[in-house]
Amino acid sequence: MKKEFIDVINKLANKGKELGFYHLNMENESFDGKHLTVKGKEYIYFSSCSYMGLETNEKMKLAAIDAVQRYGTQFSSSRTSISLTLYEELEDLLGKIYGKPTYLAPTTSLGHISIIPTIMDTRDAIIMDQQVHNSVKNAVQMVKGDGVYTEILKHNKIDYLETRIQILKQSYDRVWYMCDSVYSIFGDTAPFKDITPLLDRYEQFHLYVDDAHGMSWAGKHGRGYVLNQMPFHEHMIVTSSLAKGFGSCGGALIFNDEAQKELIRNCSSSSIFSGPLQPAVLGASIASAKIHLSNEIETMQDELFERMFYFVQTAANHNIPIINNEMTPIFYVAIGKPEVGQKLSLFLQNEGYFSNYMVFPTVPMKNSGMRITLTRHHSLQDIQKLLERVAYGFEKIMKEENYSMEELYEDFSMIDPSKSNKVEPVIRLKVA
């Protein structure tokens, strides 16, 4: 990254800190998953990625305490040497959730660093979606330096992806497409119904999916969005995060067979040299996995889907411009002009709501917006009141800034949602 760009990011970050948007500290003496206290003011928290609300689950808290009582605060050894039996128990449970061999990494980011440099070499070509998570891009940079061919695909342009596969397969043994299942800013999803046929059509085509934001709220046993949309393919690797919907910490690496899993266990640098997860985390994760393997997770999924559907309906009723209605727990209110976004964020904070104000360079300059995430901790009334304040503040500030909805739609290449959006009933496909 060039120094000039670093300087721009640093300047914007410092400005955001001055305005009270970033690098804040929660002052709560305890946390219920919904209420925050920052600088003496209480907020309803609408930027958590703990979609299922499991971080406050009593079973998980008691399991974490029990693990600490039994094993201490840390078992300080590389897993190459020796690890707690809790690891084996958790990986076995994760394997039952996914129906495939699963390896546990300290984080999803370290999981990418485990897989990509170990499995891929100069016989491979890598195509990254433009919006794939930065942790994937960082791992790809490691192999790019070793001569692995990489390129960027415009976001979700699957027709062009097929063209690139046809060309690259003539020169490379494997052509990888790397994408997120659910994209963390706009909440949109990868078009797996269009990607799946390519895996069967082209022998050299392989798929690498980061399903961090799809875990728990979607799929049988909460196995995630991607495996709720398509069956596991032999030319596929899936990674996920236990730090979001799952309610604990760690990265799940899901493979087609045991040989791939053992290759990562034996040869990846982060597997050999990284420290282990703490006993408390492993204990809580085991409790969460047992919840996922019970009927309880289906009830939790239904509760979250009710909130997601209500959000989409209510936003449409208030003519709030939402980037997509794909029924994920991540929603992006299109604002466009940074000055409008800054004022709206401050307005919502003053009203007692905490969400993420997204601005350049995280999003394009004229694509600023409010990222709002839903969890089971929120009530329908919480959502209704938030969106009422968003609608009121949005209209008021747009007028103050002399910024029209027509300009906003042009900046986002959108059609007026009041004329085009149609809220359909939620249908959850279940893939065994």
Protein language model regions, located:
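Conserved PLP-anchoring active-site segment centered on the Schiff-base-forming lysine
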Residues: 118-134
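Active-site PLP attachment segment
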Residues: 227-263
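Structural motif of enzymes handling amino- and sulfur-group chemistry
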Residues: 276-297, 303, 315-316
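Active-site phosphate-binding strand-loop segment of PLP-dependent enzymes
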Residues: 151-208
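Conserved N-terminal alpha-helix of the aminotransferase class I/II PLP-enzyme fold
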Residues: 62-107
